[in-house]
A protein has these predicted regions:
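Short, Lys/Arg-rich, polar N-terminal cytosolic tail immediately upstream
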Residues: 1-24
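Short, charged juxtamembrane terminal tails flanking transmembrane helices
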Residues: 2-8, 224-232
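Hydrophobic, aromatic-enriched alpha-helical segments typical of multi-pass transmembrane helices
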Residues: 17-53, 59-63, 67-225
Length: 232
């Protein structure tokens, strides 16, 4: 009787620990969806609060640039986005334990993107248009290029996490990001030369929002996968 009671108590404790671990994992994965929504909302808020800002012709980075009237408002929100992305990356790493190596690599890359973001905007913001170029602008461009590369790699590795449908969607996302990124890069050179960039805001947002959508879709699929496993 006593032994049976001990085993029952241990079983309950193990069940509670497993339940807490599952809840924590779901929260981490939910951070992926929340991070994408927060970034889009922060971008929209900044564009609304920035007098004279053009959503079609100005870059997202200009919202947090040195001299931007909304930089102080947006900084905590962008940093929160990075923290959420890091949490999601950890969640992907944990979810990949019973999946495949490619998903583990994707989780590590997403975590790295979030870590870079924590240093990118606070320490290496660009200057507002017409203010000239300094070391921070150069580092901003370098970190931007590194982040884009990590994003493409994360999507490429993450494409193998689910079936053919998600793989095709991921490949299409990469193609769109490369095309939009090339156009944004061309306008970036014009921005550095103090020339007009009538479509920079559009092409850059296609690039960024395409990636954010992919992160959100991955988060939803991973959450659904866990729900189906729990119901089985």
């Amino acid at each position: 009787m006593a032994a049976t009671g001990v085993h029952t108590s241990e079983g309950r404790q193990t069940g509670r620990l497993a339940s807490r671990a599952e809840t924590a994992q779901r929260v981490l994965l939910l951070c992926g969806l929340m991070s994408s929504l927060l970034y889009v909302g922060t971008d929209a808020l900044g564009a609304i609060r920035y007098p004279g800002y053009s959503y079609t012709s100005q870059a997202i980075s200009e919202l947090g640039a040195i001299g931007s009237p909304v930089a102080a408002l947006l900084m905590p929100l962008f940093l929160t986005y990075d923290v959420l992305l890091i949490a999601f990356g950890v969640g992907v790493l944990r979810a990949a334990v019973d999946r495949n190596r490619a998903l583990r690599v994707a989780g590590a890359l997403l975590t790295a993107i979030g870590v870079i973001g924590l240093f990118w905007l606070p320490f290496f913001p660009m200057h507002a248009r017409g203010a000239g170029t300094t070391l921070t602008d150069t580092m901003h461009i370098v970190l931007s290029a590194v982040t884009v590369l990590l994003i493409l790699l994360a999507i490429g590795f993450g494409a193998r996490a689910f079936g053919k449908g998600f793989r095709r969607y991921s490949i299409a996302t990469i193609l769109i990001l490369v095309a939009a990124g090339a156009l944004a890069g061309r306008d970036g050179a014009r921005l550095a030369a103090q020339l007009p960039t009538p479509w920079l805001g559009v092409t850059e947002r296609i690039n960024v929002f395409g990636y954010l959508l992919w992160v959100a879709v991955l988060a939803v699929l991973l959450l659904r996968s866990r729900s189906h496993r729990a119901d089985a």
